[in-house]
A protein has these predicted regions:
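Feature for intrinsically disordered/low-complexity regulatory segments and propeptides
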Residues: 1-149, 171
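Intrinsic disorder/low-complexity polar-acidic segments
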Residues: 140-365
Length: 365
């Protein structure tokens, strides 16, 4: 199994105002923010970029109101204008606005969905903000709704709690609950269940704990992803040690399917996992630990490929990875270990999801 640094990366970089100790606190913040937002459909020829404020950029529509660009919405607007956002950030705002307007004028006319927020006065004057520019087919699932769903599930399963971690930079200090992080681009949520100890088949006498990891973006930065897994522990630096994916749910923010299925899908995966007894889960892992998939690498690859677990390349790489880390690559547990390590090493979200799903299917092989 491999360490999961997803939450650690957020823990080490997020400011305090994007950190939340409970689902209740996160939900209150997100609901207030969602109430300030609205969606507007428009076409590219109706968008005009202007230099605004102190070397800032904004967009103006038919109403004449100015909406400030965020770092993320500038990326999206630059994409629509076929212009490099990183380069534009180094230009004076008047020149950057001219470049964007030219790019929009020569690009094929397209429809867009604008996600606007009326930001209240809070150290700065009240203003309108463009949080996202997406296609009309974008199906936004509000993080506040996702957190409300998790909150309801947690109330029926109170053993799921926020991990105890250090404050950022406070190594060795007192630990405090941290359920996750949320900013203007995405949100990360983590819960753990230490009340159910799962025997580790690779380390007799040791036990694994259950965890949930959920990621969502309202502005087109990420999919809606839910991972349920086992780990050795979650440490004070928010590293999920020796993690192993058991089940996963992942959907793109596009079309009607995610609107219909996200609520039920998250609940089904969560409840199925919560209702699985420690004895059943231990038996499942022990069986995977001893289950032989084949006498050698070609046979293992052939057995798993025929059942459409993964590609031959992925299975072969997982076999090598398991062997490299002193696991038996001819067993289901060894391949699970190899696939998990490959997932942690991949820079591509879609590939990580596919590898995690493959590992989950190997456990049920």
């Amino acid at each position: 199994m491999a360490n999961n640094y997803t939450m650690h990366q957020q823990w080490s970089t997020r400011p305090d105002d994007e950190r939340f100790s409970t689902l209740d606190a996160m939900l209150d913040h997100l609901k207030a923010e969602a109430d300030q937002c609205r969606t507007l459909d428009t076409d590219s020829d109706m968008i005009r970029v202007i230099s605004h404020g102190d070397n800032d950029l904004g967009v103006v529509g038919k109403s004449g109101n100015v909406a400030h660009l965020t770092h993320w919405s500038l990326n999206q607007l630059a994409g629509a204008a076929k212009s490099p956002a990183a380069y534009l950030r180094h230009l004076p705002s008047t020149l950057a606005a001219a470049c964007l307007n030219h790019g929009l004028s020569v690009a094929p006319r397209a429809s867009h969905q604008l996600y606007l927020r009326q930001c209240p006065a809070n150290g700065t004057p009240a203003h309108l903000e463009l949080r996202a520019l997406t296609s009309p087919g974008y199906s936004r699932i509000l993080t506040s709704n996702v957190v409300a769903r998790l909150q309801a599930l947690q109330s029926n399963n109170p053993e799921w709690q926020a991990p105890l971690v250090y404050r950022r930079g406070d190594f060795g200090g007192d630990r405090e609950p941290c359920v996750g992080f949320s900013g203007d681009r995405d949100a990360y949520i983590c819960l753990q269940n230490e009340g159910v100890g799962i025997a580790d088949p690779a380390a007799p006498g040791e036990h694994l704990t259950r965890f949930i990891l959920l990621v969502n973006s309202e502005v087109g930065a990420k999919r809606l992803d839910l991972t349920l897994g086992l780990c050795e522990r979650i440490c004070g630096n928010f590293i999920i040690w020796n993690s192993r994916t058991i089940a996963a749910f992942s959907m793109r923010h596009y079309g009607d399917k995610i609107r219909r299925e996200w609520h039920r899908g998250i609940g089904q995966v969560f409840n199925d996992y919560s209702n699985l007894s420690a004895r059943d889960e231990t038996a499942k892992l022990q069986a995977a630990h001893v289950r032989q998939l084949g006498p050698g690498k070609p046979e293992v690859i052939d057995a798993l490929f025929k059942r459409e677990i993964a590609t031959k390349q992925q299975i072969g790489d997982a076999y090598d990875m398991a062997e490299r880390h002193d696991r038996n690559p001819r067993t289901a547990w060894g391949i699970v270990h190899g696939l998990t390590r490959l997932s942690q090493m991949s820079p591509y979200a879609d590939e990580r999801i596919d590898l995690d799903r493959a590992a989950s299917r190997v456990l049920d092989f």
